[in-house]
A protein has these predicted regions:
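Flexible, surface-exposed loop regions and adjacent strand-edge segments
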Residues: 14-16, 154-156, 187-196
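Detector for outer-membrane/organellar transmembrane beta-barrel domains
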Residues: 84-151
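Short glycine/proline- and aromatic-enriched beta-strand/turn motifs that initiate or cap beta-hairpins
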Residues: 1-40
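Sequence/structural signature of outer-membrane beta-barrel proteins
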Residues: 2-8, 35-44, 62, 71-79, ...
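Residues on the lipid-exposed face of transmembrane beta-strands in outer-membrane beta-barrel proteins
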Residues: 20-26, 53-59, 70, 86-92, ...
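Residues that define the transmembrane beta-barrel architecture of outer-membrane proteins
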Residues: 14-18, 47-51, 64, 80-86, ...
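Outer-membrane beta-barrel "beta-signal"
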Residues: 93, 164-172, 177, 197-215
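Repeated loop/turn-to-beta-strand initiation elements of outer-membrane beta-barrel proteins
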Residues: 28-34, 62-68, 94-99, 133-139, ...
Length: 215
C-alpha cells in the first residue's frame, strides 16, 4: 500500500508500507494469526515495524454473524507502546458493527498515562455494496473515544474517521479523512496536523494490492 492507515491515522508518515500475515482457522470457529507491517511516525523516530498477534472465535447464528477476540499490538523498537484490545463484531447481511476496548497498555506511556481496562474504545460501522462487475464498494465510519490515542499516536481524545473504498481482484483504492477534535488544551488539531508530516486532518488517497495463499 502507498500509505498505512489505521483508524484514519497514517502509521507510515504517508509513505509506502509492506504488510503480511499468517492465519489459521479451525472448523469449530476458533482462529489465530499474526500480522506485520513497517511503520514510521517521524523521519527520525525509533520505530521500525509493528507485529500483531490475535486470536478469537467467529460463527453464525441464523442471519447474524459474530466474531470476538483479542489483538495485541507490538512495536519492535519501543515496547512502551505495546498494547492489547478486546474486540467484538456483529454482522447482518452486508452491514457490520465492531467495538474494540483497550485491555492492557504498557505503564510507561507518559505522565498520567497509566491506562486501565476500557479507558479507550473504538467503534466502527461498515457497509459493503457488491457490484455486478465483482467489485465491492465499502463505506466506513469509525469513532475513537478516550485519552490513549493522544499518548500513543498524538491524536486528540475523540475523533471520527470516514472512508469510502472500492476493491476487486486484490486491488483496492480508498479515500479517507478524519475529523479531529480539540484536546484538553484546545490545540489538538493544529499540533497533531503538523507532527512529522502526518497531515491527518487532510483527505488521503490510498491504493493497495493484496493476495492470499492457502497452505
Amino acid at each position: 500500500t502507498n500509505n498505512y492507515i489505521w483508524r484514519g491515522l497514517t502509521q507510515s508518515i504517508s509513505e509506502a508500507a509492506v504488510q503480511g500475515g499468517i492465519d489459521y482457522a479451525d472448523d469449530s470457529g476458533f482462529y489465530i494469526g499474526t500480522w506485520a507491517s513497517n511503520v514510521s511516525y517521524d523521519s527520525d523516530d525509533v520505530y521500525s515495524y509493528e507485529h500483531d498477534i490475535y486470536f478469537g472465535y467467529a460463527g453464525e447464528a441464523g442471519d447474524i454473524s459474530y466474531d470476538i477476540g483479542y489483538l495485541y499490538y507490538n512495536y519492535d523498537s519501543n515496547a512502551g507502546f505495546d498494547f492489547g484490545e478486546l474486540y467484538g463484531t456483529v454482522g447482518v447481511g452486508n452491514f457490520s458493527a465492531t467495538l474494540s476496548l483497550l485491555v492492557n497498555a504498557e505503564p510507561d506511556e507518559g505522565p498520567g498515562q497509566d491506562f486501565g481496562f476500557a479507558e479507550a474504545s473504538y467503534t466502527s460501522l461498515d457497509y459493503v455494496i457488491p457490484l455486478e462487475s465483482g467489485a465491492e464498494i465499502g463505506l466506513h465510519a469509525g469513532f475513537h473515544e478516550g485519552d490513549f490515542m493522544y499518548a500513543f499516536n498524538g491524536a486528540t481524545d475523540d475523533y471520527w474517521d470516514l472512508n469510502i473504498s472500492i476493491a476487486k481482484d486484490g486491488f483496492s483504492a480508498m479515500v479517507t479523512t478524519t475529523t479531529l477534535g480539540d484536546d484538553d488544551d484546545g490545540d489538538g488539531v493544529e499540533d497533531y496536523a503538523s507532527m512529522g508530516a502526518r497531515d491527518n486532518d487532510e483527505i488521503k488517497f490510498v491504493v493497495g494490492y493484496s493476495m492470499d495463499f492457502e497452505l
